[in-house]
C-alpha cells in the first residue's frame, strides 16, 4: 500500500467517524434507574428529560432524592461513554504498518 492510498483511506475513515459521531450525539437515549427515575440524554451528554416518581419526593428528606438523581445520571452518562467508545473503536480498526 502506498502512502497516498493510506492517506486517502485515513481521510475516508475520519469523515465516516465524524458522521457517525455526529449522528450519535444527536440521538436520544433513555435510561431508567430502579423504576423510580427516568432520564433521556442525547449522545452529546445533554439531559433532554428527567422524570422522578412522585413517591420519591419527600420534602423532609431531600438528600435521598438528590443522591438517587445523581446516581441515575452518572449511570446514564457512564453507559453513553461506553457506547461512544464502542462506536469509535468499531469505525477505526487498528492500522498495521509493515515492519512494526
UniProtKB/Swiss-Prot annotation:
Location comes to: Cytoplasm, Nucleoid
Task: Give the superkingdom in one word.
Answer: Bacteria
Q: Provide this UniProt record's keywords sorted from A to Z.
A: Cytoplasm, DNA-binding
Give the main localization category: cytoplasm
Which SUPFAM superfamilies does the record associate with it?
YbaB-like (SSF82607)
TM stretches of this protein: none
Q: Which GO terms describe its cellular component?
A: bacterial nucleoid; cytosol
MF (Gene Ontology): DNA binding
Q: Provide the function of this protein.
A: Binds to DNA and alters its conformation. May be involved in regulation of gene expression, nucleoid organization and DNA protection.
Do you know which HAMAP family this protein is assigned to? Answer: DNA_YbaB_EbfC
Assigned protein family: Belongs to the YbaB/EbfC family.
Report quaternary structure and partners: Homodimer.
Q: What is this protein called?
A: Nucleoid-associated protein MYCGA6000
From what organism does this protein derive? Mycoplasmoides gallisepticum (strain R(low / passage 15 / clone 2)) (Mycoplasma gallisepticum)
The upper taxonomy is: Bacteria, Bacillati, Mycoplasmatota, Mycoplasmoidales, Mycoplasmoidaceae
Amino acid at each position: 500500500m502506498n502512502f497516498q492510498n493510506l492517506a486517502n483511506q485515513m481521510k475516508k475513515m475520519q469523515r465516516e467517524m465524524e458522521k457517525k459521531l455526529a449522528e450519535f450525539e444527536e440521538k436520544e437515549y433513555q435510561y431508567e434507574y430502579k423504576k423510580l427515575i427516568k432520564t433521556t440524554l442525547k449522545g452529546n451528554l445533554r439531559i433532554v428529560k428527567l422524570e422522578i416518581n412522585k413517591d420519591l419526593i419527600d420534602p423532609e428528606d431531600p438528600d435521598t432524592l438528590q443522591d438517587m438523581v445523581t446516581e441515575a445520571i452518572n449511570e446514564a452518562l457512564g453507559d453513553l461513554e461506553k457506547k461512544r467508545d464502542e462506536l469509535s473503536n468499531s469505525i477505526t480498526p487498528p492500522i498495521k504498518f509493515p515492519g512494526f
